Amino acid sequence: MNIEQRVTELHQLLHQYNYEYHVQDNPSVPDSEYDKLLHELIDIEREHPELKTDDSPTVRVGGTPVSAFEKVDHDTPMLSLGNAFSEEDLLAFDKRVKDEVGEVEYMVELKIDGLAVSLKYVDGVFVQGLTRGDGTTGENITQNLKTIHAIPLTLSVPLTFEVRGEAYMPRKSFLALNAYREKVGEPLAANPRNAAAGSLRQLDSKLTAKRKLDIFLYSVNDLRELNAQSQSEALDKLDEIGFKTNHERKLCRNMEEVFEYIKYWTEKRNDLAYDIDGIVIKVNDLSKQDELGFTAKSPKWAIAYKFPAEEVITTLNDIELSIGRTGVVTPTAILEPVKVAGTTVGRASLHNEDLIREKDIRIGDSVVIRKAGEIIPEVVRVVLDRRPEGTKPYNMPEICPSCGHELVRIEGEVALRCINPKCDAKLVEGVIHFVSRTAMNIDGLGERIVEVLYNEDIINDVADLYTLERERLLTLERMGEKKVDKLLAAIEASKTNSLERLLFGLGIRHLGAKASMVLAREFGTMDNLKNATVETLTQIDDIGEKMAQSLVTYLQNEDIINLLEKLEQYGVNMRYTGVTKDDIELHPVFGEKTIVLTGKLTIMSRSEATKALTNLGAKVTNSVTKKTDIVIAGSDAGSKREKADSLGIPVWTEQMMVDALRN
């Protein structure tokens, strides 16, 4: 046997033993035998690097570190699921489904508490692995995913498709990681989910390999790649070709059986070797999934039931007040630090005066804390039988804790507000919002630096940011030359932002990012917008009377007029530079059309096509309905194309779309 033949044999043996151990949980050889063969292959590849391949079992131990993760568009968006928190929510979901498609069965699966990933295979070889990211674009973590032994590097059949699943850290691996961190004096990981996410984002895959991650696969981008007619059949076929799926799933005939499954796992979840945070319920029949379709954010045929949040008792030591950019006074509970759902909680929002009175929350009380949606800490209730003697009902102040101005409560609102336009806290919060990523996107201006600039009287409003001098900034603590130069470059770059970013950055009450875009596109310039009336504004889709009145009042304020003049004087762009209504009129093919993309696109990515069509005024949706104007079908388009044909909706090829875009 020559060296090439031995390498091939080692590949086959190691892949087989790996599958038996990590997927089937039924090893046929001891660990020592596997390790012996693996080290033999490592030695051969070290001496003959030309024999090392991308699917070699040795990639399981990690490879050369990378400097950063590449951003890659998903071929099909990785949508999140809608959430249910009660039986009532699930019954409402069941009714919506049955109203549209009649009786259904549900495939019910454990919701693994990990990190969603997609795995791409070409001719049966694993070639790319991405994080969910924002659902449209993920990070390429292929090398790190290759260290997860349950992910097959090659399949038994030469399929070209994308499979999705949840990478996670087993509890045993999590305990081992924290034991090691404690030993070497490093901070402990908060919970297995955070540890798994951090492990998969290590730039050195050798570190990822040491974390002993695992994975369950739960879906294929196009389930017909497996010739499956249902979710249950698709999962069985994933098992057959070498993937690891979760076998605690169950096919339920009705919601009563779903409730039984939820009740069982609510009680038994702690017996598992991994964390789960809920149950996923999916319509089993794929044809009915297609019929139900999607919303912009999630499939209509699936929902995630979230387990009730863990509740713990701690002491409320104080109530701290903060002032937001619109003057709203928000009370925050300062708690005796306590572990809740894996992380330490020391603060929780009390929202407003009414909530404090309704729950009779007092300083010194023992309170029940939980995380809403297992994310945001909240005070659930007071433990009255533990209330210390001498506590007094908490009263919100009558004057602003920042500027001393009288606080007011506007009719119809629950919040107390400081209406002093010169309030220090409001001005600082306004600047923080102005520089944020979704507004003017001035990188390097964090909350601490903004507060220093304001307290040192270097800035008094957002316009002063454009007068910052290098020499003055260098005198500030922790502001070195590189940091200052980077900050000044970011400020200069922000001058060219399109009008919608400036509008949103100004923090106008009731005006969000979407409305800012609508107004910028509609009016084109700040001058045009200044001349708008409430009547003209309310004629625009998505602009209500409250928003219109707030905008007109804001732009007529003398201080704001002066502020905008200063910003323009300092070179800040006051025009909309994106695609305008006039541009849309130049593209009558796609302007104001509802378009559905389906199948595999090969010339453009799905996100590129969506962006191009949207910029020309099209509305891109996921479901084919009577309101759809055009269906653009790539290869393997499936049921959406069939539905378009049945409704008489024009079906275009990808090339036809590209030709129209070019023209």
UniProtKB/Swiss-Prot annotation:
NAD(+) binds at D31, S32, E33, Y34, D35, S80, L81, E109, R132, E166, K282, K306. It comes from the Bacteria. Zn(2+) binds at C400, C403, C418, C423. Its cofactor is Mg(2+); Mn(2+). Its EC number is 6.5.1.2. SUPFAM superfamilies: BRCT domain, DNA ligase/mRNA capping enzyme, catalytic domain, Nucleic acid-binding proteins, RuvA domain 2-like. Keywords: DNA damage, DNA repair, DNA replication, Ligase, Magnesium, Manganese, Metal-binding, NAD, Zinc. CDD domains: BRCT_DNA_ligase_like (cd17748), LIGANc (cd00114). Gene3D superfamilies: 5' to 3' exonuclease, C-terminal subdomain, 6.20.10.30, BRCT domain, DNA ligase/mRNA capping enzyme, Helix hairpin bin, Nucleic acid-binding proteins. GO terms for cellular component: cytosol. Signal peptide: none annotated. The active site is at K111. One of its GO terms (molecular function) is DNA ligase (NAD+) activity. NCBIfam families: dnlj, PRK07956.1. Belongs to the NAD-dependent DNA ligase family. LigA subfamily. It comes from Macrococcus caseolyticus (strain JCSC5402). InterPro entries: BRCT_dom (IPR001357), BRCT_dom_sf (IPR036420), DisA/LigA_HHH (IPR041663), DNA_ligase (IPR001679), DNA_ligase_AS (IPR018239), DNA_ligase_CS (IPR033136), DNAligase_adenylation (IPR013839), DNAligase_N (IPR013840). It catalyses: NAD(+) + (deoxyribonucleotide)n-3'-hydroxyl + 5'-phospho-(deoxyribonucleotide)m = (deoxyribonucleotide)n+m + AMP + beta-nicotinamide D-nucleotide. It is an enzyme of class 6 (ligase). DNA ligase that catalyzes the formation of phosphodiester linkages between 5'-phosphoryl and 3'-hydroxyl groups in double-stranded DNA using NAD as a coenzyme and as the energy source for the reaction. It is essential for DNA replication and repair of damaged DNA. GO terms for biological process: DNA repair; DNA replication. This is DNA ligase.
